A protein has these predicted regions:
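RNase III-family endoribonuclease catalytic core
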Residues: 2-119, 124, 129
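Pyridoxal 5′-phosphate
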Residues: 138-139
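Short acidic capping loops at alpha-helix termini that bridge into adjacent secondary structure
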Residues: 132-135
Length: 140
């Protein structure tokens, strides 16, 4: 990658909470399953954090968004693990010889409280993105 070609992407995602808890689809954020008896309505596992990270990377690459690459109209992505989608996006980035330096994520939600899960979520993100934990920031 040309050192003068730094790119910045912005990602955003939102899913509504399901009116009923779906045990087969527990709330998953940043690759961490939360034990809060909540579910999100989504075609995939609904991990809004990983979806936003995918969108940020795709945006930096000029490759559209997650819906373009993994459409919710395609049955093969039904229930897809967002970590798998992220790995495909990271492979696209690597093929272009780009790399991540850091991620800074803001979650806007009143529930669930994320502070008890924050350390595990940062660790999961760092592992998925192959970044040191010090380069992963999560605010809620």
């Amino acid at each position: 990658m040309d050192p003068n070609s730094m790119r910045i992407g912005h990602g955003y995602d939102v899913h509504r909470f399901d009116v009923e808890y779906v045990a087969a689809k527990p709330l998953t954020l940043a690759g961490v399953v939360l034990e809060d008896k909540m579910s999100l309505v989504a075609h995939s596992d609904g991990d809004v954090i990983l979806h936003a990270v995918c969108d940020a990377i795709l945006g930096a690459l000029g490759e559209g968004d997650i819906g373009l690459h993994f459409p919710d109209t395609d049955p093969k992505f039904a229930g897809a693990a967002s970590g798998d989608l992220l790995q495909e996006v990271l492979a696209m980035m690597g093929a272009r010889k780009h790399y991540l330096v850091n991620v800074d994520i803001t979650v806007i939600a009143q529930v669930p409280k994320l502070t008890p899960h924050r350390i595990n979520m940062i660790s999961s993100l760092a592992n998925l993105l192959e970044l040191p934990e010090q380069r992963v920031n999560l605010k809620a």
